[in-house]
């Protein structure tokens, strides 16, 4: 077993020659769709000027320090009040510069790559005859963009330093969003309705059901890093404090899917840690921390009088029947349209959203699309399980945490559409980066020429 072992530096992932042109074509398509969307609703001149200057600044920063630009993109993930979000513009610039300068590398299990390419191809095929071509183009463009971003991130994370940059950026966005959301729920601050819609924490997200799950992967990463410090040098007390803030954010999102996501993720992390050497001690430490965080949550709920609303949210809601009815409509539409109704078209056929990644894939891309997206997720889970069982981290990012984060999202995906969640693709990319590292470590070292 290799748990806790310091891994030697590894060479960068091998470059697949077709990935660069494919990513460039996809990036150009996404840029064209963004321009089309903005042309239909042109912003004020001052806004255009500000965005233009920021765009030039990001280009310059990316050319000089791509790591700094990547950190900014990830730190902006908590600002999702508009689409495209600020983080998306920064990511597009970073990816474009990486393509132009030859720094675009990608690593993914072959099965995942084939399934991903097949899913996008099926999506394109199903988009030929759709009710709303503009919605289909935008939806497919977002899918392509997230795919390219995940592929780029999987190759970008090739050292412990870069892994720390990625997690630090994500953690900055998550902790800031959690703190803003919790304060907006509990304190009578001006403009609190902007950060806590209907009494539920949203921070700068549009939906509390996305805000809550966004925080979960960072909870799990910090949790494993407390037990096996490899990523951050901060004291365990500070990590525990950050976990407390993040968990409060999940709780005050009042999202049952986010709660389930967190419970599943923690359960997976505990199971993996229990199977490792010295697992009993780690499980006890996690259990103690969980009890302390639970006491903190109970105290805050009782002190703020939020207990009644919590129990009300935990019960079956009237709109739940509508959600399940929408899923039934999706399954029925798959019977009528074997190749699917086209990307983003579910709402054109039903009066409600799919509220399930799997039902949406079945309805919009047909049975082939569902099989391909399942193959993508299963191959990624398999890579995550292999790393977690062997104790191989992704350059310091705990493999148990990444497996738990992915499993939590997959369970959450039963009751909400997660395909366009940015943090889903971040988790997938980090798992792929860990898979590539294991593959590199298996390669025999290159022979060293001896001078005569």
List the predicted regions and their residue ranges:
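N-terminal signal-anchor transmembrane segment
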Residues: 18-101, 125, 129, 409, ...
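Alpha-helical transmembrane segments of multi-pass inner-membrane proteins
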Residues: 28-31, 54-59, 120-125, 145-148, ...
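Transmembrane alpha-helices of multi-pass inner-membrane enzymes
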Residues: 29-31, 95-98, 402-410, 417-452
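Transmembrane alpha-helical segments and their membrane-water interfaces
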Residues: 56-61, 94-108, 114-179, 411
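A membrane-periplasm/extracellular boundary helix in multi-pass inner-membrane enzymes
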Residues: 179, 183-188, 252, 270-318, ...
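Long extracytoplasmic/lumenal interhelical loops at the membrane interface
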Residues: 191, 311-368, 384-394
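Hydrophobic transmembrane alpha-helices and their immediate junctions
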Residues: 271, 367-409, 435-436
